[in-house]
Amino acid sequence: MQKNRKNVKKKLVLIIIDGLGLRFESQGNGFALAKTPVFDRLFQEYPNSLIAASGQEVGLPEGQMGNSEVGHLNIGAGFVVYTGISIINNALKTGKFFENEKFILAFRHSIKTGFPLQIMGLFSPGGVHSHQDHLFALIDFAANFGVKKLNLHLFGDGRDVGPKSIKPWIKMLNLKLKNYENYKIASISGRFYSMDRDKMFDRVELGYNALLGKAENTFTDPIDYVNFQYEKGVSDEFFEPAINLKVNKKDFLADDHPVIFFNFRPDRARQLSHLILQTDLYEQKPKNPIKTDVFVSMMKYEGINCLVAFEEMRVENPLGKLICMAGFRQLRLAETQKYAHVTFFVDGGVELELENSDRILIDSLKVQSYADFPQMSAVEITDKLLEVGQKYDFIIMNFANPDMVGHTGDLKATIKAVEILDFQIGRICKWAEEKNFDFFITADHGNAELTEDENGNPSTKHTTFPVMLISSDKTIKLKSGKLANIAPTILDYLGLDKHPDMDHDSLIIKDK
């Protein structure tokens, strides 16, 4: 790693826009339909290229939409990071899934104690936080191993898939459960309750209580309950926690019951896991605590001490670490919704303590729908950059509003979010020129460019469209690539060597 700065002419900001892909069709396209004079000028006058941000190009299954966690991991790593879903799918393909010692430990505990096995997680084929195929495999594995009682606690998705799409999957699940006498859907709740990541513990505790068999809403048929929620105008994401009256009260989650949480993505699994295990990760403690020593997470949940079924791919030398070793002073800047992504995820999925590195968190608005506040904290993030940015050599920042507003499926709100973002990018362009900064702009995955499906219905999920890479330096040319090329590109631009772990190259076209 080069220690001198003699080749570095300017300081650099990496602007990561969350959920903004590039799509030619204008229908339902919150980016194309927005008035974006700044982006228009950048695309016309500055070096830019297309970046693959989904599927096998980022370590996901073919055709799988990208997501924020995977996107930031790949941006920082300099190589394709194979994460949760790919690792688990490969274990299913090779059969090693059905030899997993952590699952077997939970099964044996259930058989030995007579307590039901409690399996919980996001029930959809979305592939961002979980996949229902993994649940189906767990059910078969448990049954073949001899587990007699099994309770399922399903979290409605409605974001990474259509907002009202769970019914056919529950019907599939019911058909499977008919083969097993004491395997039941014990509770249903929306991810809004069970998968919060913003310390909304009043909300999370409602999801937690449903695991314990404590909820205001009840059902005897899960399909009937879904229909009841739809009639109230409630989509999958916001299902009010409910419990199955056909499940014996003593069979809901209680002391010493074995638990498997089949979400592989950690960020939205940590708070609920904390309530069950009563960790030191958060101050909040459950009003109805239970104790269990057999809690299996699909992948590692940072800060949660439990059994981990599958080991993650390690990123030992991410971009931020190399920048630190070169003596650059760094800043990471984002609002709450994406703060973990510009710190934990872009640093390889670990909490790195880097010298000469500061982190600034701007609070996200605590609202039920960002469609009502499409600006989110974009203005405050830009204000903070303009206030303190000149003190740093290298800055990674994130704008969350295209993604979070895109998740609402509200086209008008998404257009507004993009227009607000465009204005903030314009402010940064002016500031960068005044303060002698260069910048690269990219995105972690698509979303805002497709807020309606072909029938005009809201689309709330991510996409497989490519994203942008824009440089403020008109003296260079960029070729197309994938997110794993971004770290080598930045290091190359700054005159620094990439680490040998980084098997992807810079996208800056060299003169022959």
From Swiss-Prot:
Name of the protein this chain belongs to: 2,3-bisphosphoglycerate-independent phosphoglycerate mutase
Keywords of the record, alphabetical order, are: Glycolysis, Isomerase, Manganese, Metal-binding
Q: Which gene encodes it?
A: gpmI
Locate the residues binding Mn(2+) 2.
18, 68, 444-445
State the free-text cofactor note: Binds 2 manganese ions per subunit.
Q: Which SUPFAM superfamilies match?
A: 2,3-Bisphosphoglycerate-independent phosphoglycerate mutase, substrate-binding domain, Alkaline phosphatase-like
HAMAP family xrefs: GpmI
Q: Which organism is it from?
A: Mesomycoplasma hyopneumoniae (strain 232) (Mycoplasma hyopneumoniae)
Q: Which reactions are catalysed by this chain?
A: (2R)-2-phosphoglycerate = (2R)-3-phosphoglycerate
Keyword Isomerase in the entry? The reply is yes
The active site consists of 68
**Record GO biological process:** glucose catabolic process; glycolytic process
Q: What's the stated role of this polypeptide?
A: Catalyzes the interconversion of 2-phosphoglycerate and 3-phosphoglycerate.
Under which pathway is this protein filed?
A: Carbohydrate degradation; glycolysis; pyruvate from D-glyceraldehyde 3-phosphate: step 3/5
Cofactor(s) needed for function: Mn(2+)
